[in-house]
Amino acid sequence: MQVMTTPGRLGPSLATTLQAFHDGRPPGADEDVHMVPAIVDHVIERLSSPGDFVFDPFAGFGTTLQRAVRLGRRAAGIELLPERVEYMRRRIPEAWVTTADARDLGPVLRLFAGTVDLIVSSPPYMTMTHHDADPLTGYEKSGGDYDRYLDELGTVAEQCAQLLAPDGVLVWNVADILHEGVTTPLVDDVATALKAHLSLDAVVPIDWDQLPHDLTADVLLVFRRSLHTKK
């Protein structure tokens, strides 16, 4: 991880624990793919106000949406896997949720372009090697390619920029990964992909008592809508 900038309103770093991560698994979820709820709360409380509109393009099991609703924000999200969409609709009826591919936000843009105050998400991760499953298909298709994955995350970010209000903020949780002896610098690579479409505002490290899985560094990438964002 090389990229550094000022931490802004989130503080210089955030602390959490592996136990908090495990405890934060949504009820009924079959895997740990969520952000730590306390970190999501911190982001939402610091970067939005009650009544603001929060969006998640990789909604998963709905941690961001559930926390946003609990904190008095309006919430919307999309998820590729229909069973997870049904799960969120049952669990968070106050949120707007639909089945969609984050690489094609056209229908969402037609509804919400320029109105989202805060985007909070964690994209599905990929390593540079030993990773045939394609993350942006819900890991359900093979033929994954790391460079294509980064390009497609850039496509997601470009559309997210169009969803943001003029003073809107995007926060993505991204981590470097050590797998099969190879470290994937996902933080730097994702930051580079997003900087083509948004203005980098801060990189906020998350300090764990014990990093989960095979992560070697974990951060929040904070971006603002660029002046050149398409309307």
What kind of feature is each model-predicted range?
Residues M1-K231:
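Class I S-adenosyl-L-methionine-dependent methyltransferase catalytic core
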